[in-house]
Regions:
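Core-facing hydrophobic residues within beta-strands of well-ordered domains
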Residues: 56, 237, 382-383
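Conserved AMP-binding/adenylate-forming
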Residues: 238, 247, 251-340, 357
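Active-site phosphate/ATP/adenylate-binding loop shared across adenylate-forming ligases
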Residues: 2-34, 94-236, 246-254, 258
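AMP-binding/adenylate-forming catalytic core of the ANL superfamily
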Residues: 210, 314-425, 440
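Residue-level signal for inorganic ion chemistry
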Residues: 59, 118, 210, 255, ...
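Nucleotide 5′-phosphate-binding alpha/beta core
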Residues: 1-117, 123-137, 144, 204, ...
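General small-molecule cofactor/ligand-binding pocket signal
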Residues: 184-187, 264-266, 428-432
Length: 447
């Protein structure tokens, strides 16, 4: 009896897809020793137009929902003549795909190699399916060697969730396959990843890069003191990449001082993957334009906004075959600028302003939690754990002291005065010494 054998369904050599045509483009860049990061804008936009049209053809042929929406919008062929015409393509809203694993799937289910899903904290989760080629072929085509300086001599500690969502596995693939680094799969405080073991592993293998969330970077630094591990001696990082949560520039400065290294921001999502990342200038996020096309729209009128105008971030993925996201409304707020960065990169610069659903109304103004955190972190006596509590128009701050000689009452008075100067309203302040730490996303706003 002949033994049954199994063959991997996807390989770089054998796989066929609408995306194969872009291999030659990126291979030519590699041969010329350049990356998409510094291409002239016209060449970037020419590539993006071709990639978008290839994606439109793919979803037209492979997905009933996408095709019906394009036809309703007046498309008779799945093609646009310029990037300006992308506005004719319908938006993809979260509620349409929430809880529906098939809605925008563009491959046969047996061709799926990986499934991720969002946390579902605001409703049913969003499922995102990938083919193996999505993950190990097309996602690795664009190189960003100016934004990521890591090489095979680096050891990257990935302290992000490996369960359900994309971040842990996504960063592991990025660093292993794109840069050849060793990876320490720390996870984020789960059953098999207690903090003490994570710190010990970083010490033993001399991690040079840490990828994690802002709150977990603070927790690791805090716990290192409790476990007798000295940052700067036992663990000597050269860089931290923050993702998964937003944070203020002041919070980032605190982490840089604590860890003694550069800290940069990375913006992405389980649905869309990589979107944008900071360069060494730290003046905004460069959009990773080999992977995505980003637009800014007015969330009410849905009109596209020009450079410099703040609105909702809309993302179109360019190198996906299993489940492309076309004009996906992220729910995040920001604005775009043409790159005039001293780093020399030509990719557009994105400035994030938080999530629409998290904006806080105080008096007559709307505030991003990042801005309020920035104001609070301007007080050096305040620790990195806090809550903003909102209740029927009242605003209360719960904060921890940090290496201060002030009494709790003195610190509360100092916070009240500083925040009143910053936002123009009075707030209640409670000094606590027991704000809970979390291994999940930090809860900063309580309503």
């Amino acid at each position: 009896m002949k033994a049954q054998t199994h063959k991997m369904k996807v390989s770089v050599d054998e796989h066929t897809s609408h995306l194969e045509q872009f291999k030659a483009f990126f291979e030519q860049l590699d041969e010329n020793g350049i990356t998409i990061e510094k291409l002239p804008r016209q060449k970037i936009e020419d590539y993006q137009l071709k990639a978008i049209n290839a994606t439109l053809t793919h979803i037209w042929n492979r997905n009933e929902y996408y095709r019906s929406k394009l036809e309703e919008a007046g498309f008779t062929v799945p093609e646009i003549e310029s990037l300006e015409q992308l506005t004719k393509v319908p938006f993809l809203n979260k509620d349409v795909i929430r809880g529906d694993k098939q809605k925008i799937l563009c491959l046969d289910p047996k061709e799926i190699g990986q499934v991720h899903l969002t946390s579902g904290t605001s409703g049913k989760p969003i499922y995102t399916s990938y083919s193996l080629a999505d993950q190990y072929v097309y996602d690795l085509l664009p190189k960003y060697l100016e934004l990521f300086k890591e090489t095979d001599v680096d050891v990257v500690a990935v302290a992000l969730p490996y369960e359900f969502a994309l971040p842990g596995l996504g960063f592991q693939r990025l660093f292993q396959f794109a840069f050849g680094t060793a990876v320490l799969s720390l996870g984020k405080g789960g059953y098999m990843a207690p903090v003490d073991k994570s710190l010990e592993l970083m010490k033993e293998f001399q991690a040079t890069v840490l990828t994690t969330t802002p709150s977990y970077a603070a927790l690791l630094a805090e716990e290192s003191e409790r476990f007798g591990i000295k940052i700067g001696e036992d663990i000597r990082l050269k860089k931290i990449v923050l993702t998964g949560e937003g944070c203020s520039y002041k919070f980032r400065e605190r982490l840089e001082k604590w860890w003694g290294c550069e800290v940069s921001f990375f913006y992405g999502s389980t649905e869309c993957g990589v979107v944008a990342v900071e360069c060494s200038e730290h003046k905004g996020y460069h959009v990773m334009e080999g992977h995505v096309k980003v637009e800014i729209i007015n969330p009410i009128t849905l009109e596209k906004l020009p450079y410099g105008k703040t609105g909702e971030i809309v993302v179109t993925t360019l190198l996906r075959e299993a489940m492309p996201m076309v004009r996906y409304r992220s729910g995040d707020i920001g604005y775009l600028q043409k790159s005039k960065c001293d780093c020399g990169l030509t990719m557009d610069v994105l400035h994030l302003r938080g999530r629409m659903e998290n904006m806080i109304r105080l008096g007559d103004e709307d505030y991003s939690p990042f801005i309020l955190e920035q104001f609070l972190m301007e007080i050096p006596d305040v620790g990195m754990w806090y809550h903003f509590k909102l209740n029927q128009g009242s605003f209360k701050i719960e904060a921890e002291p940090f290496r201060t000689e002030l009494t709790d009452e003195q610190l509360a008075t100092k916070i009240r005065k500083h925040m009143a100067d910053r936002i123009g309203i009075d707030c209640e302040v409670e000094i606590r010494h027991d704000i809970p730490r979390t291994f999940g996303k930090a809860t900063r706003i309580i309503t």
